[in-house]
Curated annotation (Swiss-Prot):
This is Lipoprotein-releasing system ATP-binding protein LolD. It is an enzyme of class 7 (translocase). Pfam families: ABC_tran (PF00005). Its main location: membrane. The complex is composed of two ATP-binding proteins (LolD) and two transmembrane proteins (LolC and LolE). InterPro entries: AAA+_ATPase, ABC_transporter-like_ATP-bd, ABC_transporter-like_CS, ABC_transpr_LolD-like, MacB-like_ATP-bd, P-loop_NTPase. Keywords: ATP-binding, Cell inner membrane, Cell membrane, Membrane, Nucleotide-binding, Translocase, Transport. Belongs to the ABC transporter superfamily. Lipoprotein translocase (TC 3.A.1.125) family.
Length: 225
């Protein structure tokens, strides 16, 4: 497999002088195309910070992130935002669905923002909702869905622009064990069908065990890979 993402000598710190806190300390990590990775470790070890920098939601203090060989943080803000929107999908612990819109409309939203006509956006959104097992919930609003269903809508929305990389930050953190298993099965299914590269931050050891690779962080450093 060829390399999709390379993290090189990455550091992230906050503050300065005696108040400086170093969250990431010289991270090196290569992610291959089509790979599935779990980032694990105790709370406060820098897992979510690393994921956010990999997804260009935050910038490193030093080091680089290369996507397809390009140092993405050399891009200007507008170019970086465009790259992020089309190349990376995100799923968070909370679904962040828009409550006034239906499941179908929520999944269509990234396409509409990207300038796709409403008539053209419906079909791919409907197809993805079918893939995550929600073909019967197209017209339901988030408040009418269970927690697991809400998260599956969020997964569909994250994939609707066909990103190469899907990043998930504690996607089952608010769910019970049975529902967590359903969300995991959904992630596995879309990975197999679409070949999307998947990186997950999780405390769920069962979920981590299903990933192809586990990367463990301790005190801002990779200690096992």
């Amino acid at each position: 497999m060829s390399s999709l993402l390379e993290v090189m000598d990455l550091t992230k710190g906050y503050g300065s002088g005696e108040t400086r806190v170093d969250v990431l300390k010289g991270i090196n990590l290569t992610v291959a195309e089509g790979e599935t990775i779990a980032l694990v470790g105790a709370s406060g070890t820098g897992k979510s910070t690393l994921l956010h920098i990999m997804g260009t939601l935050d910038r490193p203090t030093s080091g680089s992130v290369r996507f397809g060989g390009e140092d993405v943080f050399r891009l200007g803000d507008a170019a970086l935002a465009s790259f992020r929107n089309h190349s990376i999908g995100f799923v968070f612990q909370f679904h962040h669905l828009l409550p006034e819109f239906t499941a179908l409309e929520n999944v269509m939203m990234p396409l509409l923002i990207a300038g796709v006509k409403r008539s053209d956006a419906a079909a791919p959104a409907r197809e993805l909702l079918g893939e995550v097992g929600l073909a019967h919930r197209l017209t339901h609003k988030p408040g009418e869905l269970s927690g697991g269903e809400q998260q599956r809508v969020a997964i569909a929305r994250a994939l609707v622009l066909s990103p190469k990389l899907l990043l998930a930050d504690e996607p089952t953190g608010n769910l019970d064990m049975k529902t967590s298993d359903e969300v995991h099965e959904t992630l596995e299914r879309v990975h197999r069908k679409r070949g999307v590269t998947l990186v997950i931050v999780t405390h769920n050891e069962k979920l981590a065990s299903y990933m192809g690779r586990t990367v463990r962080l301790v005190d801002g450093r990779v200690v096992a890979d």
